[in-house]
Amino acid sequence: GLEALIETTLGMDNVEASATSSDRREAMQFGVADYAASCRARTTNIGGLNPHYPGDQWHDGLSRMLVACRAYGLRPVDGPFGDFNDPEGFRLAAGRAAALGYEGKWAIHPSQIDLANDVFSPPAAEVEKAKRILAALAEAATKGLGAAQLDGRMIDAASARMAENVVAMDDVIQTKSLA
């Protein structure tokens, strides 16, 4: 399949058109360095944050690309983190992308591969909670209920969809690990 690399302001402005440009398209990747240059962002740290910006200056671009990917069935992949001597910086950048719903991140150095696998793999506790959510909702459904309570919180169909995503990702990872 085809993958698109979104790395300019014009590319981001046309991200939806890019997402729908071919039936062979499978994924989109965020090219943060060229995107930063295109935005004239004041940074020289590829994929890192500028300490003078209050938050994550890449959030808007990452979010826009994620929405286009998910709306049209593509896999979103975050771009590089240039300082391969900063594993914590890589982990933080990857964590922000994973929290948004990205499925992976470029590793430009062998030291980043295990970090990426760790960040984008749901922790065992998260998988277990997701399974508990699905079980509680299945039990509620047998009683004709569309919602339930788990650990003092309301869960419903949206909770089930989020939990299914976690379990599905874990299933893929576990299957690949066994291969």
Over which residues does each language-model region extend?
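Expand to "…catalyze enediolate/carbanion chemistry for C-C bond making/breaking, isomerization
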Residues: 1-179
